[in-house]
Amino acid sequence: MAIGYACLNIGTPNTNIRSVMQRNATAEKLTEVITHNLEALEKMVDYNIANGIRLYRISSDLIPFGSSPVNMLDWPETHKEVFDRIGTKIRRGSMRVSFHPGQYTVLNSPDEDVVARAILDLAYHDKMLECLGVDNKNKIVLHVGGIYGDKEAALDRFAENFQRLPESVQNRLIIENDDRLYNSEEVLELTNRLQIPSVFDNLHHAINPPPSGGDDRYWIAAAAKTWKARDGKQKIHYSQQAPGKRPGAHTDTIQLDTFQQFYNQLDDPTIDIMLEVKDKNLSAIKCQNATTANPRPVLLEKEWGRYKYAVLERSPAIYQAIRTLLKDKETYPVHELYRLIDTAFAEELCPGYAENAAAHVWGYFKKHATNAERRQYEKNLANYRNNTGTLATMKRQLFKLAEKYDSDYLLQSLYFYLE
Protein backbone atom coordinates (compact mmCIF):
# COMPACT_ATOMS: atom_id res chain seq x y z
CA MET A 1 0.00 0.00 0.00
CA ALA A 2 1.03 3.58 -0.66
CA ILE A 3 -0.61 6.77 0.59
CA GLY A 4 0.06 9.89 -1.45
CA TYR A 5 -0.74 13.52 -2.03
CA ALA A 6 -1.25 15.88 -4.93
CA CYS A 7 1.01 18.42 -6.57
CA LEU A 8 2.27 20.78 -3.86
CA ASN A 9 4.46 20.22 -0.83
CA ILE A 10 4.15 22.05 2.48
CA GLY A 11 7.31 22.68 4.46
CA THR A 12 9.99 22.05 1.85
CA PRO A 13 11.66 25.27 0.65
CA ASN A 14 11.67 26.20 -3.04
CA THR A 15 9.08 23.68 -4.16
CA ASN A 16 6.53 26.12 -5.56
CA ILE A 17 5.38 25.55 -9.13
CA ARG A 18 5.58 28.74 -11.16
CA SER A 19 3.43 29.80 -14.09
CA VAL A 20 3.72 32.31 -16.95
CA MET A 21 1.13 34.68 -18.37
CA GLN A 22 0.73 34.19 -22.12
CA ARG A 23 1.84 37.73 -22.92
CA ASN A 24 5.12 37.05 -21.10
CA ALA A 25 5.70 33.57 -22.54
CA THR A 26 8.94 34.23 -24.39
CA ALA A 27 11.30 31.34 -25.03
CA GLU A 28 13.66 32.74 -22.40
CA LYS A 29 10.92 33.07 -19.77
CA LEU A 30 9.48 29.64 -20.49
CA THR A 31 12.93 28.06 -20.18
CA GLU A 32 13.50 29.83 -16.87
CA VAL A 33 10.17 28.67 -15.42
CA ILE A 34 10.49 25.10 -16.70
CA THR A 35 13.97 24.88 -15.17
CA HIS A 36 12.62 26.12 -11.83
CA ASN A 37 9.63 23.77 -11.91
CA LEU A 38 11.76 20.73 -12.64
CA GLU A 39 14.09 21.67 -9.78
CA ALA A 40 11.02 21.99 -7.54
CA LEU A 41 9.74 18.60 -8.69
CA GLU A 42 13.09 17.01 -7.92
CA LYS A 43 13.05 18.47 -4.40
CA MET A 44 9.55 17.06 -3.85
CA VAL A 45 10.60 13.65 -5.16
CA ASP A 46 13.59 13.73 -2.80
CA TYR A 47 11.27 14.63 0.08
CA ASN A 48 8.91 11.79 -0.81
CA ILE A 49 11.72 9.25 -0.89
CA ALA A 50 13.13 10.47 2.42
CA ASN A 51 9.71 10.16 4.03
CA GLY A 52 8.64 6.85 2.49
CA ILE A 53 5.91 8.40 0.32
CA ARG A 54 5.50 6.20 -2.74
CA LEU A 55 2.44 7.77 -4.36
CA TYR A 56 2.51 11.29 -5.80
CA ARG A 57 0.49 13.33 -8.29
CA ILE A 58 2.62 15.75 -10.29
CA SER A 59 1.23 19.18 -11.13
CA SER A 60 -0.10 19.53 -14.67
CA ASP A 61 1.48 23.00 -14.68
CA LEU A 62 5.00 21.55 -14.67
CA ILE A 63 5.58 22.71 -18.25
CA PRO A 64 3.77 26.02 -18.92
CA PHE A 65 1.65 25.84 -22.10
CA GLY A 66 2.94 22.30 -22.55
CA SER A 67 0.14 21.35 -24.96
CA SER A 68 -0.20 24.77 -26.60
CA PRO A 69 1.50 26.36 -29.63
CA VAL A 70 2.41 29.18 -27.22
CA ASN A 71 5.26 26.91 -26.12
CA MET A 72 7.29 25.87 -29.16
CA LEU A 73 10.33 24.79 -27.16
CA ASP A 74 11.69 21.28 -27.52
CA TRP A 75 11.44 20.93 -23.74
CA PRO A 76 11.70 17.10 -23.64
CA GLU A 77 15.13 17.27 -25.30
CA THR A 78 16.36 20.48 -23.66
CA HIS A 79 15.61 19.15 -20.18
CA LYS A 80 16.33 15.49 -20.89
CA GLU A 81 19.11 15.22 -18.33
CA VAL A 82 17.00 16.45 -15.43
CA PHE A 83 13.98 14.37 -16.53
CA ASP A 84 16.24 11.31 -16.61
CA ARG A 85 17.63 12.08 -13.17
CA ILE A 86 14.19 12.60 -11.61
CA GLY A 87 12.80 9.52 -13.34
CA THR A 88 15.65 7.41 -12.00
CA LYS A 89 14.89 8.61 -8.48
CA ILE A 90 11.19 7.83 -8.92
CA ARG A 91 11.88 4.30 -10.14
CA ARG A 92 14.55 3.52 -7.54
CA GLY A 93 12.27 4.87 -4.83
CA SER A 94 9.45 2.55 -5.99
CA MET A 95 7.31 5.65 -6.35
CA ARG A 96 4.21 5.74 -8.49
CA VAL A 97 3.36 9.09 -10.08
CA SER A 98 0.32 10.37 -11.90
CA PHE A 99 -1.33 13.40 -13.45
CA HIS A 100 -4.89 14.73 -13.24
CA PRO A 101 -5.63 17.16 -16.10
CA GLY A 102 -8.00 19.98 -15.19
CA GLN A 103 -11.60 20.83 -15.96
CA TYR A 104 -10.87 22.14 -19.46
CA THR A 105 -9.62 18.78 -20.71
CA VAL A 106 -12.98 17.42 -21.89
CA LEU A 107 -12.85 14.40 -24.16
CA ASN A 108 -16.63 14.05 -24.62
CA SER A 109 -17.40 17.63 -25.66
CA PRO A 110 -19.64 18.09 -28.73
CA ASP A 111 -17.24 20.87 -29.77
CA GLU A 112 -14.51 19.40 -31.96
CA ASP A 113 -12.06 22.16 -31.06
CA VAL A 114 -12.43 21.29 -27.36
CA VAL A 115 -11.89 17.61 -28.10
CA ALA A 116 -8.83 18.33 -30.23
CA ARG A 117 -7.31 20.39 -27.42
CA ALA A 118 -8.14 17.62 -24.93
CA ILE A 119 -6.32 15.06 -27.08
CA LEU A 120 -3.28 17.35 -27.26
CA ASP A 121 -3.38 17.92 -23.51
CA LEU A 122 -3.56 14.21 -22.73
CA ALA A 123 -0.66 13.61 -25.11
CA TYR A 124 1.31 16.31 -23.25
CA HIS A 125 0.74 14.55 -19.93
CA ASP A 126 1.77 11.25 -21.47
CA LYS A 127 4.92 12.88 -22.86
CA MET A 128 5.93 14.04 -19.36
CA LEU A 129 5.55 10.50 -18.03
CA GLU A 130 7.51 9.19 -21.00
CA CYS A 131 10.28 11.73 -20.28
CA LEU A 132 10.44 10.39 -16.72
CA GLY A 133 10.81 6.86 -18.06
CA VAL A 134 8.00 5.40 -15.97
CA ASP A 135 5.78 2.53 -17.07
CA ASN A 136 2.02 2.34 -17.64
CA LYS A 137 1.31 1.81 -13.95
CA ASN A 138 1.82 5.56 -13.71
CA LYS A 139 -1.53 6.95 -14.77
CA ILE A 140 -3.45 9.95 -16.08
CA VAL A 141 -6.75 10.54 -14.26
CA LEU A 142 -9.69 12.08 -16.10
CA HIS A 143 -13.37 12.78 -15.47
CA VAL A 144 -15.94 11.79 -18.08
CA GLY A 145 -16.92 15.41 -18.79
CA GLY A 146 -20.30 17.03 -19.45
CA ILE A 147 -23.76 15.68 -20.23
CA TYR A 148 -24.79 18.21 -22.92
CA GLY A 149 -28.46 17.29 -22.69
CA ASP A 150 -28.00 13.60 -23.47
CA LYS A 151 -25.96 11.48 -21.07
CA GLU A 152 -25.94 8.33 -23.19
CA ALA A 153 -24.75 10.24 -26.24
CA ALA A 154 -22.08 11.94 -24.11
CA LEU A 155 -20.83 8.56 -22.88
CA ASP A 156 -20.78 7.22 -26.44
CA ARG A 157 -18.86 10.28 -27.56
CA PHE A 158 -16.26 9.71 -24.84
CA ALA A 159 -15.84 6.11 -26.01
CA GLU A 160 -15.51 7.20 -29.63
CA ASN A 161 -12.97 9.91 -28.86
CA PHE A 162 -11.02 7.55 -26.61
CA GLN A 163 -10.25 5.55 -29.76
CA ARG A 164 -8.65 8.68 -31.26
CA LEU A 165 -6.08 8.87 -28.49
CA PRO A 166 -2.56 7.58 -29.09
CA GLU A 167 -2.17 4.05 -27.78
CA SER A 168 0.32 5.24 -25.17
CA VAL A 169 -2.32 7.60 -23.75
CA GLN A 170 -5.00 4.90 -23.81
CA ASN A 171 -2.68 2.67 -21.79
CA ARG A 172 -2.37 5.30 -19.08
CA LEU A 173 -5.89 6.72 -18.88
CA ILE A 174 -8.11 5.98 -15.87
CA ILE A 175 -11.56 7.46 -15.21
CA GLU A 176 -12.88 8.89 -11.93
CA ASN A 177 -16.45 9.35 -10.73
CA ASP A 178 -17.36 12.99 -10.10
CA ASP A 179 -19.55 14.82 -7.60
CA ARG A 180 -22.24 16.08 -10.02
CA LEU A 181 -22.70 14.27 -13.30
CA TYR A 182 -21.25 10.77 -13.53
CA ASN A 183 -21.54 8.45 -10.54
CA SER A 184 -19.52 5.37 -9.62
CA GLU A 185 -21.79 2.99 -11.49
CA GLU A 186 -21.80 5.00 -14.71
CA VAL A 187 -18.02 5.35 -14.67
CA LEU A 188 -17.65 1.64 -14.01
CA GLU A 189 -19.85 0.80 -17.00
CA LEU A 190 -17.75 3.10 -19.20
CA THR A 191 -14.40 1.74 -18.03
CA ASN A 192 -15.59 -1.84 -18.50
CA ARG A 193 -16.61 -0.89 -22.02
CA LEU A 194 -13.17 0.60 -22.73
CA GLN A 195 -11.24 -2.02 -20.74
CA ILE A 196 -9.44 0.61 -18.65
CA PRO A 197 -9.36 1.16 -14.87
CA SER A 198 -11.96 2.97 -12.80
CA VAL A 199 -10.88 5.28 -9.96
CA PHE A 200 -13.25 5.40 -6.99
CA ASP A 201 -13.49 8.74 -5.15
CA ASN A 202 -15.19 8.41 -1.77
CA LEU A 203 -16.30 12.04 -1.36
CA HIS A 204 -17.65 12.27 -4.88
CA HIS A 205 -19.52 9.04 -4.23
CA ALA A 206 -21.02 10.43 -1.02
CA ILE A 207 -22.28 13.51 -2.87
CA ASN A 208 -23.34 11.79 -6.10
CA PRO A 209 -24.21 8.16 -5.34
CA PRO A 210 -25.81 5.87 -7.92
CA PRO A 211 -29.54 5.15 -7.47
CA SER A 212 -28.70 1.47 -7.06
CA GLY A 213 -26.98 2.22 -3.74
CA GLY A 214 -23.87 0.49 -2.48
CA ASP A 215 -21.36 1.70 0.09
CA ASP A 216 -17.69 2.58 -0.37
CA ARG A 217 -16.58 -0.96 0.24
CA TYR A 218 -18.90 -2.31 -2.46
CA TRP A 219 -17.83 0.14 -5.15
CA ILE A 220 -14.13 -0.12 -4.33
CA ALA A 221 -14.40 -3.88 -4.78
CA ALA A 222 -16.28 -3.39 -8.06
CA ALA A 223 -13.67 -0.94 -9.35
CA ALA A 224 -10.89 -3.35 -8.35
CA LYS A 225 -11.98 -5.71 -11.12
CA THR A 226 -11.08 -3.10 -13.74
CA TRP A 227 -7.44 -2.99 -12.65
CA LYS A 228 -5.26 -5.50 -14.52
CA ALA A 229 -1.70 -6.51 -13.70
CA ARG A 230 -0.40 -4.12 -16.35
CA ASP A 231 -2.14 -1.23 -14.57
CA GLY A 232 -0.52 -1.82 -11.21
CA LYS A 233 -2.13 -1.72 -7.79
CA GLN A 234 -5.69 -0.40 -7.61
CA LYS A 235 -5.76 3.29 -6.72
CA ILE A 236 -8.57 5.24 -5.07
CA HIS A 237 -9.05 8.87 -4.07
CA TYR A 238 -9.87 9.74 -0.47
CA SER A 239 -10.95 13.06 1.00
CA GLN A 240 -13.21 14.46 3.71
CA GLN A 241 -15.93 17.08 3.45
CA ALA A 242 -14.96 20.47 4.91
CA PRO A 243 -17.59 21.50 7.49
CA GLY A 244 -19.66 24.50 6.47
CA LYS A 245 -18.26 24.59 2.93
CA ARG A 246 -19.82 23.74 -0.42
CA PRO A 247 -20.33 20.01 -1.08
CA GLY A 248 -17.05 18.55 -2.29
CA ALA A 249 -14.78 21.09 -0.58
CA HIS A 250 -11.79 19.35 0.97
CA THR A 251 -10.73 19.67 4.59
CA ASP A 252 -7.57 21.46 5.69
CA THR A 253 -6.26 18.19 7.12
CA ILE A 254 -7.37 14.56 7.29
CA GLN A 255 -9.17 13.69 10.52
CA LEU A 256 -7.31 10.55 11.46
CA ASP A 257 -10.06 8.71 13.34
CA THR A 258 -12.39 9.04 10.34
CA PHE A 259 -9.70 7.88 7.94
CA GLN A 260 -8.86 4.92 10.17
CA GLN A 261 -12.50 3.79 10.12
CA PHE A 262 -12.50 4.00 6.33
CA TYR A 263 -9.19 2.16 6.05
CA ASN A 264 -10.21 -0.60 8.46
CA GLN A 265 -13.22 -1.58 6.34
CA LEU A 266 -11.23 -2.04 3.13
CA ASP A 267 -11.25 -5.59 1.78
CA ASP A 268 -7.77 -5.00 0.40
CA PRO A 269 -5.66 -2.86 2.77
CA THR A 270 -2.81 -2.81 0.25
CA ILE A 271 -4.49 -0.57 -2.33
CA ASP A 272 -2.99 2.81 -3.15
CA ILE A 273 -4.78 5.80 -1.62
CA MET A 274 -4.40 9.29 -3.05
CA LEU A 275 -5.39 11.90 -0.48
CA GLU A 276 -7.03 15.10 -1.66
CA VAL A 277 -6.56 17.54 1.21
CA LYS A 278 -5.21 21.04 1.69
CA ASP A 279 -2.24 20.14 3.87
CA LYS A 280 -1.00 17.71 1.24
CA ASN A 281 2.11 15.77 2.35
CA LEU A 282 1.41 16.44 6.03
CA SER A 283 -1.78 14.38 5.93
CA ALA A 284 -0.04 11.73 3.82
CA ILE A 285 2.56 11.24 6.56
CA LYS A 286 -0.16 11.37 9.21
CA CYS A 287 -2.08 8.53 7.53
CA GLN A 288 1.12 6.59 6.84
CA ASN A 289 2.06 6.78 10.50
CA ALA A 290 -1.38 5.50 11.50
CA THR A 291 -1.34 2.52 9.14
CA THR A 292 2.31 1.48 9.16
CA ALA A 293 3.12 -2.16 9.75
CA ASN A 294 6.19 -1.04 11.69
CA PRO A 295 5.03 1.50 14.30
CA ARG A 296 8.15 3.04 15.82
CA PRO A 297 8.10 6.00 18.22
CA VAL A 298 10.86 7.66 16.17
CA LEU A 299 8.30 8.26 13.40
CA LEU A 300 6.18 10.35 15.74
CA GLU A 301 9.18 12.13 17.22
CA LYS A 302 10.34 13.11 13.74
CA GLU A 303 7.00 14.65 12.86
CA TRP A 304 6.67 16.34 16.24
CA GLY A 305 10.01 18.01 15.60
CA ARG A 306 8.48 19.70 12.57
CA TYR A 307 5.22 20.71 14.26
CA LYS A 308 6.37 21.76 17.72
CA TYR A 309 6.95 25.50 17.30
CA ALA A 310 3.77 25.85 15.23
CA VAL A 311 1.91 24.18 18.11
CA LEU A 312 3.74 26.24 20.75
CA GLU A 313 2.55 29.52 19.22
CA ARG A 314 -1.04 28.32 19.44
CA SER A 315 -1.16 26.41 22.72
CA PRO A 316 1.70 26.03 25.21
CA ALA A 317 -0.53 23.64 27.17
CA ILE A 318 -0.89 21.29 24.19
CA TYR A 319 2.83 21.67 23.47
CA GLN A 320 3.60 20.40 26.97
CA ALA A 321 0.97 17.65 26.72
CA ILE A 322 2.59 16.31 23.55
CA ARG A 323 6.08 16.42 25.08
CA THR A 324 4.76 14.35 27.98
CA LEU A 325 2.91 12.00 25.63
CA LEU A 326 6.06 11.17 23.66
CA LYS A 327 8.26 10.54 26.69
CA ASP A 328 7.01 6.95 26.90
CA LYS A 329 9.11 5.11 24.31
CA GLU A 330 7.18 1.88 24.79
CA THR A 331 3.96 3.21 23.25
CA TYR A 332 2.90 4.47 19.84
CA PRO A 333 0.19 7.10 20.53
CA VAL A 334 -0.31 8.17 16.92
CA HIS A 335 -4.01 9.03 17.19
CA GLU A 336 -3.59 11.02 20.39
CA LEU A 337 -0.62 12.93 18.95
CA TYR A 338 -2.49 14.08 15.88
CA ARG A 339 -5.66 14.72 17.86
CA LEU A 340 -3.71 17.15 20.02
CA ILE A 341 -2.03 18.77 17.01
CA ASP A 342 -5.38 19.24 15.25
CA THR A 343 -6.86 20.71 18.43
CA ALA A 344 -4.01 23.21 18.65
CA PHE A 345 -4.52 24.36 15.07
CA ALA A 346 -8.24 24.85 15.70
CA GLU A 347 -7.43 27.50 18.32
CA GLU A 348 -7.09 31.23 17.65
CA LEU A 349 -3.55 32.55 17.54
CA CYS A 350 -2.72 34.38 20.76
CA PRO A 351 -0.13 37.21 20.41
CA GLY A 352 1.55 36.31 23.69
CA TYR A 353 1.92 32.67 22.66
CA ALA A 354 3.21 33.71 19.23
CA GLU A 355 5.82 35.95 20.86
CA ASN A 356 6.92 33.07 23.09
CA ALA A 357 7.35 30.72 20.13
CA ALA A 358 9.31 33.36 18.20
CA ALA A 359 11.63 33.74 21.20
CA HIS A 360 12.28 29.98 21.16
CA VAL A 361 13.18 30.13 17.46
CA TRP A 362 15.32 33.25 17.98
CA GLY A 363 17.21 31.28 20.59
CA TYR A 364 18.85 29.26 17.80
CA PHE A 365 20.57 32.41 16.51
CA LYS A 366 21.11 34.81 19.39
CA LYS A 367 24.68 33.64 20.01
CA HIS A 368 25.58 34.02 16.32
CA ALA A 369 23.47 36.96 15.20
CA THR A 370 25.15 40.24 14.37
CA ASN A 371 24.25 43.39 16.25
CA ALA A 372 22.26 44.56 13.23
CA GLU A 373 20.29 41.29 13.16
CA ARG A 374 19.65 41.54 16.88
CA ARG A 375 18.37 45.12 16.53
CA GLN A 376 16.14 44.10 13.63
CA TYR A 377 14.65 41.24 15.63
CA GLU A 378 14.01 43.51 18.62
CA LYS A 379 12.42 46.11 16.32
CA ASN A 380 10.18 43.48 14.68
CA LEU A 381 9.17 42.18 18.10
CA ALA A 382 8.38 45.67 19.42
CA ASN A 383 6.33 46.47 16.32
CA TYR A 384 4.39 43.24 16.71
CA ARG A 385 3.68 44.02 20.36
CA ASN A 386 2.28 47.48 19.60
CA ASN A 387 0.37 46.37 16.49
CA THR A 388 2.48 48.36 14.04
CA GLY A 389 4.14 45.22 12.68
CA THR A 390 3.08 41.70 11.84
CA LEU A 391 4.01 38.22 12.93
CA ALA A 392 4.75 37.44 9.27
CA THR A 393 7.49 40.10 9.23
CA MET A 394 9.09 38.61 12.32
CA LYS A 395 8.92 35.11 10.84
CA ARG A 396 10.46 36.24 7.56
CA GLN A 397 13.51 37.52 9.42
CA LEU A 398 13.78 34.31 11.44
CA PHE A 399 13.54 32.23 8.26
CA LYS A 400 16.30 34.26 6.60
CA LEU A 401 18.46 33.71 9.66
CA ALA A 402 17.77 29.97 9.48
CA GLU A 403 18.97 30.04 5.88
CA LYS A 404 22.03 32.16 6.68
CA TYR A 405 23.12 30.02 9.61
CA ASP A 406 22.30 26.70 7.86
CA SER A 407 19.77 25.58 10.45
CA ASP A 408 18.28 22.63 8.54
CA TYR A 409 16.18 21.69 11.56
CA LEU A 410 14.41 25.05 11.51
CA LEU A 411 14.16 25.20 7.73
CA GLN A 412 12.08 22.01 7.93
CA SER A 413 9.93 23.43 10.73
CA LEU A 414 6.26 23.89 9.92
CA TYR A 415 6.41 27.03 12.06
CA PHE A 416 7.30 28.92 8.88
CA TYR A 417 4.71 27.33 6.63
CA LEU A 418 1.46 26.87 8.54
CA GLU A 419 -0.79 29.79 9.37
Q: Model-found features: residue ranges?
A:
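Polytopic alpha-helical membrane-helix bundles and their juxtamembrane interface segments
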Residues: E152-D156, N177, L181-E185, F200, ...
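Conserved protein kinase catalytic core
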Residues: V106, G149, Y182, I207, ...
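Residue-level marker for buried hydrophobic side chains located in beta-strands
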Residues: V97, L173, S198-D201
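Eukaryote-skewed repeat-based solenoidal scaffolds used as protein-protein interaction platforms
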Residues: Y124-R193, L203
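Alpha/beta catalytic barrel-like cores
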Residues: M1-M95, T105-N108, D113-A118, K127-V134, ...
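Short hydrophobic/aromatic-enriched beta-strand-loop microsegments
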Residues: Q195-N202, T292-P297
